[in-house]
Amino acid sequence: MSGDASTPEQDQNVVSGAVPATRESSPDAPEATSEQASAAVDPADRMQQLEQELSALKQEHDTLNSQYMRIAADFDNFRKRQSRDQDDMRKQLVCSTLTEILPVVDNFERARQQLNPEGEEAQALHRSYQGLYKQLVEVLKQQGVARMDVVGQEFDPNLHEAVLREESSEFAEDVVSEELQRGYHRDGRVLRHAMVKVSMGPGPSDPGSAPAEAAAAPDQTAEEA
């Protein structure tokens, strides 16, 4: 054999030595491709893309902030409504309880007007009852309960309950002329309407007075002549 001829072992070594060189160069291919792609992107296009992303994020932020503000406002309104409803319920319970006490006050007042105790023992008992009545009235005052002043006031169905209507020379028409049962209110809310008598006005004049006035007219004319 000549000196230039290669043995099979030498050929195998040459092939095996070439393979690693191919493997070492292969990882550089993706990196080169990425660099080429980056170099191919226009900076103006990239800036426009970033601005679009920023605009989308701002819009999402505004939407979420608006939703948050709306939820916060709804919760605040709910809290206020709950507080108002609880306050109204508490007032209704208090007014209902106070309304139940008013007939007891009426009984004390009727007893005070009608009874005329005689003797020291009866008078002492009467004073004891009146002491309880005064305490009860004081408690009602502390709770804001007040009596209605109705006589001489114009009839108001929101405050008064008309039981009778009669002619009156003292009060004009539709004016309360007499209080039959006390009315009470608390903080602008009616606990009990006042039962009243309402005036119908002075009524028609006496028919007998008209001829007398007519007869007096000629005499007055004659005197003037």
Curated annotation (Swiss-Prot):
Domain of life of the organism encoding this protein: Bacteria
Residue segments, region Disordered: 1-48, 198-225
Disulfide linkage: none
Polar residues biased stretches: 1-15
Biased amino acid composition, Low complexity: 201-225
This protein's UniProt keywords: Chaperone, Cytoplasm, Stress response
Alphabetized PANTHER family for the sequence: GRPE PROTEIN, GRPE PROTEIN HOMOLOG, MITOCHONDRIAL
Protein name: Protein GrpE
Protein's organism: Synechococcus sp. (strain CC9605)
